[in-house]
Amino acid sequence: MTDFLQDENLIAPPRTVRIDFDDGSFALRSPMALKPYARCIGEWIERWAHETPDALAFAERDETGEGWRKLDYRALRHAVGAVAQALLDMNLPQGQPVVILSDNAIDHAVLMLAAMHIGRTACSLSSAYSRMAKDPSRLHGMLQALKPGLIYASDAKVYGGSLAGCGVEAVTVFSRNAEAHPGAMAFERLLAAKETPAVMQAFADVLPDTHAKYLLTSGSTGKPKIVINTHRMLCANQQMMAQTWRFLTREAPVLVDWLPWSHTFGANHNLNMVLCHGGALYIDEGRPAPGLIEKTVRNLREVKPTLLFNVPRGFDMLLPFLEADDALAAEVFSRLRLAFYAAAALAPSTWQRLEAVAARVRPTRPLWLTTSWGATETSPAITSAHWKLDGAGCIGAPLPGLELKFVPNGEKLEMRVKGVSVFPGYRDAPRETAQAFDEEGYYRIGDAGFLANPAQPAQGVIFNGRVAEDFKLSSGTWVSVGTLRVKLVSLLAPHAQDVVLTGHDRDEIGMLVFPSPQGAALAPDALHERIAGMLRALRDEGAGSSQCPACALVLAEPPSLDAGEITDKGYINQRAVLTRRATDVARLHASGDAQVVRPA
């Protein structure tokens, strides 16, 4: 793997330019100029249908659950053309998107790509709002804001009920049981349409600044907003990655991926990377959850992907299987170029365990663990760590075509970004759009960072949490929530799913603990002692008030999706938890509550 990372034909060497400004701020940019990129996403489909028509594009488990339903690029282009024609025939109102409610699937992909092929905007909403939420009001609010011309879901019997009373008039389409929903259309009818020259006429009219997708922000920092993603943004971002991961242009990627297309990681980073380079995406019906992670393990064993993308919780749940079965680990890692994490910070213990498994089953090829940093508003990647990292924390250096600015903000350096892959704004939200950019046109992403080595900016940026998450103790000492949270979850591994920190304007830090399945399986006293022991160890090591919680409370109720406390990717909205559980916060900092854990 060392040779791989040192081969400039496969990986771009780390090079970064620093520009200092008179006000104490500075910016980083890549010395590489951004090369030309596709006009629109549909150009990728057209290219591979012509150049490699028999190459696999998508695969999903068939109805038996044993085999795979597969679609090559020839069949994908045929299906996209048919569905695009059907959409044109419907004469849907201009400006009204195609909204998709259900999980990743081939039909989902075909409809999304068909809409974009003819300049119609697509929007995938998290299926959790339809299937897992007890209250459909959030879904209804999103639909009313989006004003869709067409709503699709995989199964009318599963998703149809959530549409009742949504207050939106739109064509409804289902792949299964359409007859169970009044007025609905079967997806088969769209696939049966005969493509006419009108499809390619509409395709020719798609411009780089045409809206390709709407994605809703995760809500990890506030109320979800509708983010405009243009074709220019998405195509440019894949070109940026291709100039950094140069091997992508030589080796069509093979992915096994569960990450939802309602989020930028799964949709714009992973799915678009496959389509841009003529690769294959095996849609993983598994999830990082008990009873579902086993499906992911099976799929990884069968497919042996070349790239592995996941959130930290996904790696945490995979590790016990890989650690217990060397044969499985050897198969999963046999073709793997890299393991990539994003969307949340990776605990140091997880990093070390992944490296240890790889060292055992492929000792001559160390596992390249890497990451990137970005947002829904940035297509998503802003940075890439395209060199060997010694551990978690570094988010890499800016990609070609982007400028990353560091602005002093209190105790931190706030990061802001400008470039071709940054969004033009939020849909129908001029005030929020104006607030998102500073006077020089940099997007205010809200994250903080600092240089790993100020004298050598090419060594990358260290992520330093959210600017708005941090708080001061009554002593005036700042608490860096993002950094401390990752440390605490790692120290409590594997017994904590996540923690939320408290202590704003108080004398001490408190910690609300969401136990993991392993933590919940312990007797309450044993879990309390585990937490108390960790707090004692931190205190005895001399950790200061900003680095050592003085109390903890284990929460019996898991984070609520309906209340916005957690996203379907598994990361916590700190603000929502603190607001909803204000009573628990008060208990935590009061004296005399027997359930509050202290180091003693």
Language model features with spans:
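N-lobe entry segment of adenylate-forming
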Residues: 1-71, 75-90, 94, 118, ...
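Conserved AMP-binding/adenylate-forming core of the ANL superfamily
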Residues: 33, 57-113, 130-140, 188-195, ...
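Conserved pre-ATP/AMP-binding loop-to-beta segment of ANL
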Residues: 53-54, 173-175, 182-216, 223, ...
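Conserved AMP-binding A3 loop
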Residues: 69-74, 203-204, 212-239
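Conserved ATP-dependent adenylate/AMP-binding module captured primarily in the ANL superfamily
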Residues: 129-164, 195, 237-256, 289-306
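Gly/Ser/Thr-rich phosphate-binding loop
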Residues: 189, 277, 297, 306-310, ...
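Conserved AMP-binding/adenylation subdomain of ANL enzymes
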Residues: 235-254, 262-330
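Conserved ATP-binding/catalytic segment of the ANL
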Residues: 413-473, 597-599
